[in-house]
């Protein structure tokens, strides 16, 4: 039993790690913070009410809500201007806040299960009502609606609007982004109060709606020591390539080649190449993208990631370079050895790869079996993708 556990544990850990780093399907490639939006939450509630808290009674554990707006209606609310919540919620002093309350209705009783405090005068009711009205609308109309709220004064609203974009696949927003106001996007990118996690989204917006000369805005951000150390660098790089394909790609390739660049910068460049490979091979030929990634094979701290991408893309003409990693210091680390093994196992009809696998099977048959099982797991969870370098 102990032997079985020793065999299974590395496989389980590797499978879990693979699952954790997988990008959510249908999500913006340059965004973080995917998840349920307030609009989604409203959709699952029986009713959603907005108003002012009053008459909080600690003894009875009740609080009244004076209804100012009904975001999601229910028959229970008809004719009511005040509802009593079965929760003790002492309101803040003064008249600064209103409350958005999500409720279920069970056995003829109101069940408030979530409350959100928002500043008085907030656009929250109008925002949520507008979003609900667009539930069945075309994606273009939804995107333009949420775009208007990205700079809303209410952080709950602006962050929720951002989350809608974060949950949207690139293929669904690509065309709409072409008609966005570039001047407004540039203003957001330059604003000191713009959260760094939004740089990637805004840069990709500019990549579609901007002019070639707007690339200097993104280049300046990439050269800024403070901004290039934050999240969203892959989006800045991708936007640069969209606006100036030749110049932008040379910049990305230069980062990939430079071992002295910080790991996070080179990794951002690698993520940019992944985006270009999957979504925009019209900007840079796949053969060029593969050769750009191949530059990472000589860099010990990132070689394994390069091997994994080359394998997933089916770039078998670089098999010799991948197998040559056996001669490097990087190959002494288990993660690099595993990536080379997976590459060799996946490589079709290649004598050198087959010989490598045969040798490894003699040395460590358990490691080879585990690698084969992981590849089967990956194949069952991932749609088939074309192989080759797109020559």
Q: Locations of the language-model features?
A:
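Eukaryotic acidic, Ser/Thr-rich intrinsically disordered low-complexity regions
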Residues: 335-391
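Bacterial N-terminal signal peptides
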Residues: 10-23
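Structural detector for internal amphipathic alpha-helices that build alpha-solenoid repeat scaffolds
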Residues: 128-136, 159-176, 197-211, 231-243, ...
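Transition segments tied to proteolytic processing and entry into folded domains
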Residues: 22-153, 157
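Solenoid-like repeat scaffolds
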Residues: 150-154, 187-194, 220-229, 254-264, ...
């Amino acid at each position: 039993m102990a032997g079985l556990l020793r065999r299974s544990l590395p496989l389980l850990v590797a499978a879990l790690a693979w699952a954790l780093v997988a990008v959510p399907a249908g999500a913006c490639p340059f965004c973080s913070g995917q998840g349920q939006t307030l609009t989604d939450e409203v959709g699952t509630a029986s009713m959603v009410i907005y108003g002012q808290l009053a008459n909080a009674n600690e003894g009875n554990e009740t609080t009244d809500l004076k209804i100012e707006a009904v975001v999601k209606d229910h028959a229970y609310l008809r004719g009511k201007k005040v509802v009593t919540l079965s929760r003790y919620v002492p309101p803040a002093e003064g008249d600064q806040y209103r409350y958005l309350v999500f409720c279920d209705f069970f056995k003829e009783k109101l069940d408030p299960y979530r409350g959100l405090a928002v500043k008085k005068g907030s656009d929250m009711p109008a925002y949520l009502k507008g979003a609900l009205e667009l539930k069945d609308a075309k994606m273009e109309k939804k995107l333009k609606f949420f775009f208007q709220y990205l700079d809303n004064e209410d952080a709950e609203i602006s962050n929720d609007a951002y989350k809608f974009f974060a949950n949207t696949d690139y293929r669904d927003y690509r065309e709409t982004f072409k008609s966005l106001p570039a001047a407004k996007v540039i203003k957001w990118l330059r604003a000191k109060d713009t959260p760094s996690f939004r740089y990637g989204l805004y840069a990709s917006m500019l990549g579609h709606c901007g002019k070639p000369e707007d690339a200097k805005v993104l280049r300046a951000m990439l050269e800024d020591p403070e901004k290039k150390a934050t999240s969203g660098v892959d989006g800045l790089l991708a936007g640069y390539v969209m606006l100036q394909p030749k110049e932008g790609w040379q910049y990305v390739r230069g980062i990939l080649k430079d071992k002295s660049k910080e790991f996070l910068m080179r990794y951002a460049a690698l993520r940019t190449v992944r985006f270009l490979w999957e979504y925009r091979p019209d900007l840079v030929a796949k053969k060029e993208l593969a050769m750009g990634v191949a530059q990472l094979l000589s860099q010990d701290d990132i070689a394994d990631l390069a091997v994994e991408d080359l394998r997933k893309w089916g770039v078998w003409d670089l098999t010799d370079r991948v197998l040559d990693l056996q001669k490097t210091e990087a190959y002494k680390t288990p993660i690099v050895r595993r990536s080379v093994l997976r590459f060799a196992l996946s490589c079709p009809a290649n004598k050198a790869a087959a010989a490598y696998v045969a040798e490894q099977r003699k040395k460590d048959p358990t490691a080879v079996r585990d690698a084969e099982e992981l590849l089967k797991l990956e194949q069952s969870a991932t749609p088939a993708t074309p192989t080759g370098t797109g020559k």
